[in-house]
Amino acid sequence: MNFGYFDDEKREYVITRPDTPAPWANYLGSPEYGALISNNAGGYSFARSGANGRILRYIFNQFDQPGRYIYLRDNESKDYWSASWQPVGKDLESYKSECHHGTAYTKMLADYSGIHSEVCYYVPLNQTYEVWHLKVTNASACERNLTITGYAEFTNNNNYEQDQVNLQYSQFITSTVFETNRIRHIIHGNLDWVKEGEEVDNKLAISRFFALTGAPVDSYCGDKESFLGRYHGYHNPVGEENGKLSGEMCYNENGCGALAAQMLSLIHISEPTRLALI
């Protein structure tokens, strides 16, 4: 069974079937800001240390989730899919995709329902943030009213073990706020005696953010449970089913960054939208 090939000229490994027997991953970034991304956009990011500088959550020994997810929704038909095959997982008879793992970048191409999308994930040189750059082309015979939603799931603690095991404490110290075009995730911000950037009793108040550029934010959500919904998952979040995000923020729960933008896609016109994460 053939899942891909090496492109020697472009120095890429091209995955032509997304249903690989295991996650096939690539490394992005530098020792200052690193990221791991699979062919279905699963993976995590970290600052300096994968153990003690974790930013995006990733659960090992599960199903390559969560990840750097971009959802596309047709507001007329209410159908939605993802720029990578997972997490929505559309039937591969109608959903076509490729993943290009290159040196310090990963590109994902997808075609579904007359819409072509290209997303490139990379860490800019000498920077401590990552960029998800999305380009959408309408290849159908009519105008399309689309909503694009980016989703990132933050860790509640820099230490990955504390984040996934010591939930009573790690949820207590986390919160999110919405600011213009970004969701800011704050750790230890509810402790009055801890100032941002200053360490007190091994506690450090820090912020991360998930921001949208290239289009105004139409709706947003900073709480994981509110975005996904009870008894739902990454493949069918209620935020996508409803067509508009709840606007709910996180306080002492599990934080996330979910930002949605509406776009009217003209026939055979590409409209780039960029999602940036730090």
Where are these regions (language model features)?
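Anionic coordination/interaction segments
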Residues: M1-L266, S270, R274
